[in-house]
């Protein structure tokens, strides 16, 4: 047999390729069996073992959050037991414990899964996550208490951030931040009512603080009545009562009130001891004609967060470009960036 014939026979004896490149299928199958490293840039969730996941010790929600109550966890646990976790949680790699993960958001689903005796949970891995992201997530779900929001803002202020920066970071108004900052340093009677859960409305607490600054004893006595409901309506009535009382104390007394020192009524004291000759000597002053081009009392009406308000002109603002405002509907007083305020009208009071 010639050399050419032998070469042709050897070529025929070789395994034939399909032409589709499937002869490397074994290697491809091996690649498919390999797990991606932490799915760092993966598009979908993966099942992670629950025993490799830890809750973030710095998460904004605290242990006494209503969503963490045993009853609440049992409720979500029952649904997970029956239907599983339909919305994956978000985690990030734990920098202090390689191979483990910290929860970005989804702590209730995590606890509910443990309650239901699950061993894994669907999760997205997102390493680009910070505390502000956690706050935003929970704010959008209305899952943070006012105290938790205030504590977060306090931590951000301690880092040197300004209220306006924090407001922009979490997608809220500067007034929202200012209201919650008030919760960090409450007068004792108001702090007791707030911490006990009697007053949860941030607006109500801010209104009480404003009233307390002018009438601490009266507000403390009002709060001492445990049966007193803390609502916007009740606090508005309290402030109106205190304002009326203060106006009477400032001189609008009954003219027949007897002065304890002189023994005379206000009307008698007002007559004085001067005779008619004194009046003639002093002469009568003609009332000065009012200037029609000047306002006796200016009222500047504005709009803030789509709510009617007015500028408080006799209170010093905290900084340039800021001012004190008062909402027309509930009387709440607060600081606001003038960049968020729309001028509506200038009236005479």
From Swiss-Prot:
Keyword tags: DNA-binding, Plasmid, Repressor, Transcription, Transcription regulation
Matches recorded under SUPFAM superfamilies: C-terminal domain of transcriptional repressors (SSF50037), KorB DNA-binding domain-like (SSF109709), ParB/Sulfiredoxin (SSF110849)
Signal peptide annotation: none
Protein family according to the UniProt entry: Belongs to the ParB family.
GO biological process, one term: negative regulation of DNA-templated transcription
Species this chain originates from: Escherichia coli
Protein name as annotated: Transcriptional repressor protein KorB
Pfam families linked: KorB, KorB_C, ParBc
Gene3D superfamilies given in the database record: 3.90.1530.30, 6.10.250.140, KorB DNA-binding domain, KorB, C-terminal domain
């Amino acid at each position: 047999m010639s050399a050419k014939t032998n070469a042709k026979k050897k070529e025929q004896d070789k395994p034939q390729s399909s032409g589709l490149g499937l002869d490397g299928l074994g290697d491809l199958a091996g690649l498919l069996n390999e797990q991606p490293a932490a799915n760092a840039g993966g598009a979908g969730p993966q099942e992670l073992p629950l025993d490799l996941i830890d809750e973030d010790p710095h998460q904004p929600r605290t242990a006494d959050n209503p969503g963490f109550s045993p009853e609440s966890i049992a409720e979500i646990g029952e649904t997970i037991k029956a239907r599983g976790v339909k919305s994956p949680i978000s985690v990030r790699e734990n920098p202090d414990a390689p191979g483990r993960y910290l929860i970005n958001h989804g702590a209730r689903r995590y606890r509910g899964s443990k309650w239901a005796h699950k061993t894994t949970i669907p999760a997205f891995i997102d390493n680009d996550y910070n505390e502000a992201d956690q706050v935003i997530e929970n704010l959008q779900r209305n899952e943070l208490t006012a105290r938790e929001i205030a504590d977060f803002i306090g931590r951000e202020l301690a880092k040197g951030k300004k209220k306006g920066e924090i407001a922009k970071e979490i997608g809220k108004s500067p007034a929202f931040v200012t209201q919650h900052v008030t919760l960090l340093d409450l007068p004792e009677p108001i702090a007791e009512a707030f911490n006990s859960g009697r007053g949860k409305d941030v607006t109500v607490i801010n209104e009480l603080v404003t009233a307390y600054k002018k009438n601490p004893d009266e507000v403390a006595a009002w709060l001492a009545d445990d049966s007193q409901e803390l609502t916007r309506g009740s606090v508005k009535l309290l402030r109106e009562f205190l304002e009326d009382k203060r106006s009477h104390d400032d001189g609008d007394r009954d003219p027949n009130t007897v002065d304890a020192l002189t023994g005379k009524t206000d009307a008698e004291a007002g007559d004085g001891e001067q005779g008619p000759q004194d009046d003639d000597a002093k002469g009568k002053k003609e009332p000065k004609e009012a200037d029609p081009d000047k306002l006796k009392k200016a009222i500047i009406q504005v709009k803030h967060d789509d709510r009617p308000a007015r500028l408080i002109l006799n209170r010093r603002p905290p900084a340039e470009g800021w001012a004190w405002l008062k909402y027309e509907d509930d009387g709440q007083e607060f600081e606001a960036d003038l960049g968020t305020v729309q001028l509506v009208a200038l009236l005479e009071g």
